């Protein structure tokens, strides 16, 4: 079976179908590489767009509430809950002055001399 694009660009060149996705294959939709258009080989109409997939698959709670109050959503608080205000912590220091570091006090190492194997003195810095 040969497929041809409804536009004039496919009338002269050889037919070859290109399905770009699984959705295109299910709809028997193909892509014309010359005019960069999608078409359906059965009736040469442009294919339907893929169905919208929501980011959050929320299921209403069971049992469903009566129709008058709004439905509650299970496992989906991002779209149902109002946004929380951010907690702002006032800075402890002015923005123009960095905090003062603690004064650096040099620490002298204490030396420990031990005698190990064959009476060789070894100095450890602690």
Curated annotation (Swiss-Prot):
Residues 1-28 form the signal peptide. Residues 93-105 have a biased composition (Basic residues). This is Uncharacterized protein 119R. It comes from Invertebrate iridescent virus 3 (IIV-3). Keywords: Signal. Residues 85-107 are annotated as: Disordered.
């Amino acid at each position: 079976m040969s497929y041809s694009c409804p536009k004039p660009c496919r009338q002269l060149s050889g037919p070859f179908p290109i399905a770009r996705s699984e959705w295109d294959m299910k709809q028997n939709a193909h892509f014309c590489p010359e005019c960069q258009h999608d078409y359906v080989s059965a009736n040469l109409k442009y294919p339907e767009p893929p169905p919208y997939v929501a980011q959050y698959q929320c299921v209403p709670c069971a049992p469903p509430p009566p129709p008058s109050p709004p439905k509650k959503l299970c496992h989906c608080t991002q779209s149902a809950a109002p946004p929380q205000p951010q907690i702002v912590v006032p800075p402890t220091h002015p923005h123009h002055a960095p905090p003062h570091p603690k004064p650096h006090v040099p620490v002298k190492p204490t030396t420990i001399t031990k005698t190990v194997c064959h009476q060789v003195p070894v100095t450890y810095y602690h």
